[in-house]
């Protein structure tokens, strides 16, 4: 399955594209601070 981009809905960080993490409680992908 395709990864979720910035602000995409997610259930876990595994749903998000590289350098993004799922923000728990908000359930969207956001930058995880890595390059």
UniProtKB/Swiss-Prot annotation:
Keywords: Amidation, Disulfide bond, Ion channel impairing toxin, Knottin, Neurotoxin, Potassium channel impairing toxin, Secreted, Toxin, Voltage-gated potassium channel impairing toxin. Disulfide bonds join 3-17, 10-22, 16-29. Signal peptide: none annotated. InterPro entries: Huwentoxin-1. One of its GO terms (cellular component) is extracellular region. The keyword Glycosyltransferase does not apply. Expressed by the venom gland. One of its GO terms (molecular function) is ion channel inhibitor activity. It comes from the Eukaryota. It is found in: Secreted. The modification Phenylalanine amide is found at residue 35. Its main location: secreted. It holds the Pfam family Toxin_12. The presence of a 'disulfide through disulfide knot' structurally defines this protein as a knottin. Belongs to the neurotoxin 10 (Hwtx-1) family. 62 (Vatx) subfamily. Negative results: does not have effect on TRPV2, TRPV3, TRPV4, TRPA1, TRPM8, Kv1.2/KCNA2 and Kv4.2/KCND2. Selectively activates mammalian TRPV1, the capsaicin receptor, a non-selective cation channel expressed by sensory neurons of the pain pathway. Is less potent than VaTx2 and VaTx3. Interacts with distinct regions of the channel than capsaicin, since it only acts on the extracellular face of the channel, and capsaicin binds to the cytosolic side. Also activates avian TRPV1, which is insensitive to capsaicin. Significantly inhibits potassium channels Kv2.1/KCNB1. This is Tau/kappa-theraphotoxin-Pc1a. It comes from Psalmopoeus cambridgei (Trinidad chevron tarantula).
